[in-house]
Amino acid sequence: LAAVVILIGFGIYVAYQNSYTGMLKKGYRAVNEKEYMAAEKYFDRAIIKDKSRPDAYVGLAEIYLDQNDTDGAEDVYLSAIETQPTNEKLYQAAIDFYMETKQPEKVASLLEDCEDDNVLASVSEYVCEAPEFKPEEGTYKEVQEITISSDTEGEIYYTTDGTDPTAKTGKKYKEPILLEKEGTTEIRAIVVNMKGIPSGVISQTYTIE
């Protein structure tokens, strides 16, 4: 009986060691020991077992981050999303990566390329709609007040010097922009949502004659 119990226990141990969770544990241990090739092998084996779960991709990205290769870590997520464009958890993992590595501006680009409504709904708090201008760009013979708005809750920032605005370099939009002098003015604007994620830059050019 004791032998049977031992065999069962050993079988459970082996099963765990070869399970998804077991591969993750081995992978992170290898990362901590700077054994990156071994870590990659373990995380790849975990992905083979279940490619839909984000944990192993996070582990693969950690291999690159541990070597100060942020671009390599980013490629892990983008490649996974390319093959699984409807995987909500992968998108969330990629967003977490961008936020943790202080690259919130890349979240907007990631979600702009997403065509799956379920994914967009699951990460709706991160979605940042680009601003809209009224009136539209063009040539006018009289003074114009340019209104900038967005359906996204957050702050609008703009520039009139031809540079792309950021929350640090742009002017915070508080009231319509008055164009009263003759000449051409390019207004560029973004929205920064409550998560600190900026939208894409929208540019409109106005000429007052």
What are these regions (language model features)?
Residues 32, 44-48, 78-82, 116:
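Conserved structural position within tetratricopeptide repeats
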Residues 70, 74, 78, 88, ...:
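Short, compositionally stereotyped local motifs that mark structural "simplifiers"
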Residues 1-22:
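Long, contiguous interaction/recruitment modules in multidomain scaffold/adaptor proteins
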Residues 21-22, 55, 89:
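Start-of-helix register in tetratricopeptide repeats
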